[in-house]
């Protein structure tokens, strides 16, 4: 602090030694914006050898079990999930048998190809006879 005798004013200098904490803002994920993602484990095989681990398969294969054999998955499923898998089971069984599969997989049924209607046979541009107007 210093005093100037001619003006009778006082000047003081304060130094702020406090450090303010840094605030990091993050977007809060909500249920609407959070999309379910597939998490691949290290034992997933990359069949195409292109360093891609993704699947376009929508059907789940359920192998046959011996009588009396239980699975840990069946006890963990809710009634909604088991109802959903039963919806496609009848359709998947018929599709699986016709496609060479064992018929044990539950399928969504979206793999059926639409049969095209046979097109009417029409001549192409080279086969058509030109029409002449009478003069």
From Swiss-Prot:
Residues 110-120 have a biased composition (Basic residues). Transmembrane segments: none annotated. Residues 1-19 have a biased composition (Low complexity). The keyword Amino-acid biosynthesis does not apply. The keyword Nucleus applies. Residues 90-103 have a biased composition (Gly residues). GO terms for biological process: glycogen metabolic process; intracellular monoatomic ion homeostasis; mitotic spindle assembly checkpoint signaling; regulation of protein localization to nucleus. Coiled coil: none annotated. GO terms for molecular function: protein phosphatase 1 binding; protein phosphatase activator activity; protein serine/threonine phosphatase inhibitor activity. This is Type 1 phosphatases regulator YPI1. It comes from Debaryomyces hansenii (strain ATCC 36239 / CBS 767 / BCRC 21394 / JCM 1990 / NBRC 0083 / IGC 2968) (Yeast). The gene is YPI1.
């Amino acid at each position: 602090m210093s005093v100037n005798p001619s003006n009778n004013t006082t000047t003081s200098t304060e130094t702020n030694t406090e450090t303010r904490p840094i605030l990091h803002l993050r977007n809060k994920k909500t249920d609407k914006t959070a999309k379910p993602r597939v998490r691949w484990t290290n034992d997933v095989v990359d069949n195409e050898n292109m360093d891609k681990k993704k699947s376009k398969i929508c059907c789940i294969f359920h192998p046959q079990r011996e009588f009396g054999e239980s699975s840990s998955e069946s006890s963990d499923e809710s009634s909604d999930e088991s109802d959903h898998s039963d919806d496609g089971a009848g359709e998947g069984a018929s599709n699986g048998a016709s496609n060479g599969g064992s018929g044990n997989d539950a399928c969504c049924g979206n793999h059926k190809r639409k049969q095209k209607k046979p097109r009417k046979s029409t001549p192409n541009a080279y086969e058509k006879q030109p029409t002449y107007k009478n003069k």
